[in-house]
Amino acid sequence: MNNSSAIPVIKDLVLIGGGHSHRSVLKYFAMNPVPGLRLTLITRDLHTPYSGMLPGYIAGHYQYDEAHIDLRPLAQFAQARIYHAEVSDLDFEKSNVICAGRPPIHFDFISINIGSKPGTLHIPGADNFAMPVKPIDRFLTQWDQLVDKITDSKNAFHLAVVGGGAGGVEMALATQ
């Protein structure tokens, strides 16, 4: 992107979500600006968690600011517009992103990186007893509530980590 008034905006690239991929895109365009390309980041979270540090954060090795990335300086470095909003709709006929409380945002190119959400609807009891790690921001809120509940209780507490990948093992070790 180039904010010079001599170079008009020719194309709009809109990034929805501040996940890993879009952080890399912002960094790339900050270091390799494209004249006439306007970048826009739409994100519901201005501080996005870095998932690789999640087990260390849960274990108490990192503070919030160490395990999260503030997207505002990164967007500024890339000369990107940043909107703190949640996308409610995409209008492909008019090439607009719709967010509550703001005018439509035009795009020529769009990239969506909003993270995953595990499907727990069809697992009996999951809504009452499971804490999916994704989306991470919701997990962290639930985790803090769980830690408070355990700390205030005199009863034994049993925790099961479901998932045998490297992330599951790291989370199991971090919760000890």
How does the language model describe each region?
Residues 1-10, 80-160:
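FAD-binding core/adjacent interface of flavoenzyme oxidoreductases
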